UniProtKB/Swiss-Prot annotation:
It is a multi-pass membrane protein. This is Large neutral amino acids transporter small subunit 4. It holds the Pfam family MFS_1. GO terms for biological process: isoleucine transport; L-leucine transport; methionine transport; phenylalanine transport. It is found in: Cell membrane; Basolateral cell membrane. It comes from Pongo abelii (Sumatran orangutan).
Amino acid sequence: MAPTLATAHRRRWWMACTAVLENLLFSAVLLGWGSLLIMLKSEGFYSYLCTEPENVTNGTVGSTAEPGHGEASWMNGWLSCQAQDEMLNLAFTVGSFLLSAITLPLGIVMDKYGPRKLRLLGSACFAVSCLLIAYGASKPNALSVLIFIALALNGFGGMCMTFTSLTLPNMFGDLRSTFIALMIGSYASSAVTFPGIKLIYDAGVSFIIILVVWAGCSGLVFLNCFFNWPLEPFPGPEDMDYSVKVKFSWLGFDHKITGKQFYKQVTTVGRRLSVGSSMRSAKEQVVLQEGHKLCLSTVDLEVKCQPDAAAAPSFMHSVFSPILLLSLITMCVTQLRLIFYMGAMNNILKFLVSGDQKTVGLYTSIFGVLQLLCLLTAPVIDYIMDWRLKECEDASEEPEEKDANQGEKKKKKRDRQIQKITNAMRAFAFTNLLLVGFGVTCLIPNLPLQILSFILHTIVRGFIHSAVGGLYAAVYPSTQFGSLTGLQSLISALFALLQQPLFLAMMGPLQGDPLWVNVGLLLLSLLGFCLPLYLICYRRQLERQLQQRQEDDKLFLKINGSSNQEAFV
């Protein structure tokens, strides 16, 4: 039996803490591909594609044999070669594609069925993916193809876990942004999971046993969701407070009414009650004569609070707006850069150390540990996006007792939307600067310097999604936020599929040398500066519009003697 929203609210701290842990262990774990790749090769996945070399002796994972490019080597008693790398990288491409592309349909499904069912499905898919990998590892020569299905389910299940956890912060009021940062940070830090599992694997624990236990832990996630997550979605901060336990059926309200609708309806009632005492005044009599009923029936509440749809741009208008198109370019380039590096990192390191598998394994573990930096970087970008917003004036807020304070000179506040655009511009400029720095360090064939590349890669990955989300929230209507974010994820995931041909080009014609691929991606990443440059122009446009509105308000005040523009209900 699913708990109610009130019960879920009482358990919100338990749900939030477990959600952070579950994100770390079960969400985007596929981003720790470098460590998983070593384990898959050590277990013989697609080893049958390799031809046994004549001059390389049998070794282990830590073998220091240095075969030439394209030659086979031994890992834990299994052959390893370029054909195997290409096939496994293709499986990673499929899984990472689903990790991003599934966002749009997930948003549609969650709007219809709520987060509970989606999270149950995601945890079940993750458990099945672990069992499929374990089953494939039992007979790798015959069942290696299962890795494609397993990684697809892994990506889908992981994104279900991430997507549903982002609804939990709605229950924490003023701490909402902090918990969103924690959820995003734990999602981005989940790349540390496979490096941690690799440490257990290197300690001698069977790969199959590890995966079976992991699947069992995913079953615990299923049970936690089953007993604690409600059927209804968690209302946002602007929605009804959980402490309200009064039933409003006597008012004829639907049980799924949102807090925003409730607020508008109750506000309408309050206005009519305040008007009731002066109903006999001339102005109200005119209103009554024009057919505007001021009664308190439930029928009268139904249509008096309709949103101003005319003020909001259409969805297609938002899709073809310059900000969205430039953000798509930025996200596509960034996603391709990050995904290619994760997929090709082992081969890049192998090229730098001339095939020393022990050193490759060490640096792969370092990369995995550094993913925990995302828990720190996610709040940083959140702070940048919220910079000075508390000092701003919200356009939706109506000034109270403005006439009484006309003689007092007040400190002029910033416009909230302009400040949000300014913050987004700074966030994107800083993030893209880090991305360019990452591209430069990748060009330098120095092994210790790659640790700096790991750090920059982690920071950019933790920054970019929060920056895009903050920009969309500032520019577009809230009703379009989910659809636009899902569309952006889908398009950037499709573009990131280019990492497979880039990997094939690096392993084939370029003979394992990533130099020219990195040069091309570095030049491509310069396109990311187009968005902050446009945001500067857009901010100036908003400032001109704000100045025009202020001049209009002064003119209205001069003509009417008051700046309080009221609308009669």
